[in-house]
């Protein structure tokens, strides 16, 4: 089933915090994107107001159900902004994570990264996620008792890979997140992100728009089917998943 999760907490070391409005979208077929813009960016953050962003297809993650509400997910991100921008002390390669369902409906994610090299000391992290109902305009939490939306929420994924660009758009219910990156750029000038919300009126509202080429990211998702092509300002996107 598709999922939309809002992060409630991020912790490295003894002090938890949350400075972002992070949403992670996971499609029915397992494609994913996580956009993590700062709520109150300051200083150098103003030019690139993101803690992090990453995305990938289901070919870039290995998911294993361990039972008793525990799942492991091992990621090899297609897009990792830290890697794309060559940020110093950035983990490279697979990221191993463990996800545990809480009775409340929240999901705890734990794992470790190796920013100084695979043979160096690891850095452990912890994140807490709240599933929300993607079929609602407001951020309505999902508890173990109100998950009926899941069978009705649409799940649409568009992808672009050509000589100049990589890109992925994931539509989960009313909520849309996407990225477009220029190949061989590796600066913030090559990154573009959108987060859209389809309102009750039928119109879409930009909650996030970053980059000089966001107009190349599709912003309408009607009359599609798997395998079809959408052209947005000269860039062709393939529909790789369609459940509506």
Swiss-Prot record:
In-chain residues carrying the UniProt-annotated modification Phosphoserine: 143
Gene3D superfamilies in the record: Protein HRI1, C-terminal domain, Protein HRI1, N-terminal domain
Top-rank taxon: Eukaryota
GO cellular component: cytoplasm; nucleus
Record's keyword terms, sorted: Cytoplasm, Nucleus, Phosphoprotein
InterPro entries: Hri1 (IPR031818), Hri1_N (IPR038744), Hri1_N_sf (IPR043047)
UniProt xrefs under Pfam families: HRI1
Subcellular location: Cytoplasm; Nucleus
Record note on quaternary structure: Interacts with HRR25. May interact with SEC72.
Family: Belongs to the HRI1 family.
Name by which UniProt lists this protein: Protein HRI1
Organism of origin: Saccharomyces cerevisiae (strain YJM789)
Protein encoded by which gene: HRI1
């Amino acid at each position: 089933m598709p999922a939309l999760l809002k992060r409630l907490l991020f912790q490295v070391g003894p002090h938890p915090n949350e400075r972002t409005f992070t949403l992670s979208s996971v499609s029915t077929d397992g494609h994913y994107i996580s956009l993590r813009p700062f709520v109150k960016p300051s200083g150098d953050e103003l030019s690139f107001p993101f803690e992090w962003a990453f995305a990938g297809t289901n070919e870039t993650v290995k998911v294993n159900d361990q039972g008793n509400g525990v799942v492991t997910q091992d990621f090899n991100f297609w897009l990792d902004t830290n890697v794309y921008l060559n940020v110093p002390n950035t983990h490279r390669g697979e990221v191993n994570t463990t996800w545990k369902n809480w009775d409340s409906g929240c999901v705890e994610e734990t794992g470790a990264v190796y920013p100084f090299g695979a043979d160096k000391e690891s850095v452990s992290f912890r994140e807490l996620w709240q599933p929300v109902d993607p079929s609602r305009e407001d951020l309505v939490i999902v508890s173990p008792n109100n998950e009926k939306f899941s069978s009705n929420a649409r799940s649409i994924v568009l992808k672009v890979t050509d000589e100049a660009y990589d890109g992925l758009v994931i539509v989960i219910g009313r909520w849309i997140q996407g990225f477009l990156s220029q190949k061989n750029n590796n600066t913030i000038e090559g990154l573009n992100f959108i987060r859209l919300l389809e309102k009750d009126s039928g119109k879409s509202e930009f909650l996030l728009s970053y980059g000089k080429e966001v107009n190349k990211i599709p912003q309408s998702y009607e009359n599609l089917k798997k395998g079809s092509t959408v052209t947005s300002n000269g860039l062709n996107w393939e529909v790789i998943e369609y459940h509506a």
